[in-house]
Design a protein with these regions (language model features):
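Long, highly charged, low-complexity internal segments
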Residues: 1-5, 40-45, 74-190, 195
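Short hinge/loop at the helix->beta-strand junction immediately C-terminal to the helix-turn-helix recognition helix
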Residues: 12, 187-188, 206
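Extended, highly charged linker/hinge segments and catalytic-adjacent loops that couple domains
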Residues: 10-84, 118, 126-163, 214-236
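Short beta-strand "wing" residues that participate in macromolecule-binding interfaces
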Residues: 15, 190, 209
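Active-site lining segments that contact anionic ligands and/or coordinate catalytic metals
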Residues: 10, 58-60, 100-104, 204
Length: 236
């Protein structure tokens, strides 16, 4: 919150102690003009959001940049990161849906009754993801997630087959971010009280902040490659 306070005091973002999700007409028009100019008309989709929380107070609009044309700021690391997050989220909120193509293939084994699966996914239209993917060289990742054109009954060979043993995971421990989200969902506190509340319960010893995410568990992964089985023992 202190980083957001600095951005607000310097005039980079609007008032930050709010849980509103709505944007002003002026802000929505600024987003529309930027999106159409930089990405094209098909990337724009006007959206207006409302807060589902019963205790929400929407005297202010959502946290957003004061100038959408200002893509980045030349400040210290934490301020740059937070501004970038706010800028991208604001712009993405007024953009079209992304369109993904997902392929799931079931493969029968001629030697036994085992069924194997292969999954692939690719982006047909970036939509709002354009803001987050911009500047990332993800061509290799997209190719890795694609499947070739296949026909029913087609005979296939294999490079390798993975068999992984997994366990049902218990609920994760709270992080500061997930705890704030839970407080918001339960209607406890306000944006201006979340940070002080979390600091207070730590200072009084009610909770302890640590790096321990739980006990590591061992699992096995069996890989079949060119008729040879290899077993790896991994942890999660």
């Amino acid at each position: 919150m202190s980083v957001a306070q600095k951005l607000y005091e310097k005039g980079y973002i609007t008032y930050m102690r709010t849980d509103s999700t709505s944007l002003s007409k002026e802000a929505m028009d600024d987003c529309k003009n930027y999106i159409k100019k930089e990405y094209g008309n098909k990337f724009y989709k006007e959206r207006q959001y409302s807060n589902k929380s019963k205790n929400a107070q929407e005297a202010h609009e959502a946290i957003r940049p004061t100038n959408m044309k200002l893509h980045s700021i030349d400040k210290e690391y934490d301020q740059n990161r937070l501004y970038d997050l706010i800028w991208k989220r604001t712009l993405a909120s007024q953009m079209s849906d992304a369109q993904l193509e997902r392929t799931n293939v079931k493969i029968e084994n001629s030697n036994n009754d085992k069924i194997f699966t292969a999954n692939g996914e690719m982006i047909n239209f970036d939509g709002f993801l354009k803001v987050y993917l911009e500047g990332n060289d993800n061509e290799d990742e997209e190719k890795a997630g694609m499947l070739p054109n296949l026909k029913i009954g087609e005979h296939l060979g294999y490079n390798f087959i993975n068999a992984t043993q997994r366990f049902t995971s218990p609920p994760y421990r709270f992080t500061e971010a997930s705890l704030v989200k839970q407080l918001e969902e339960l209607g406890i506190g306000r944006p201006s009280t979340y940070a002080p509340t979390i600091s207070t319960v730590q200072r009084r010893g009610y909770v302890e902040k640590g790096q321990n995410e739980g006990l590591e568990r061992i699992y096995e992964q069996i890989i079949l490659t060119k008729g040879s089985l290899n077993t790896q023992t991994l942890t999660e």
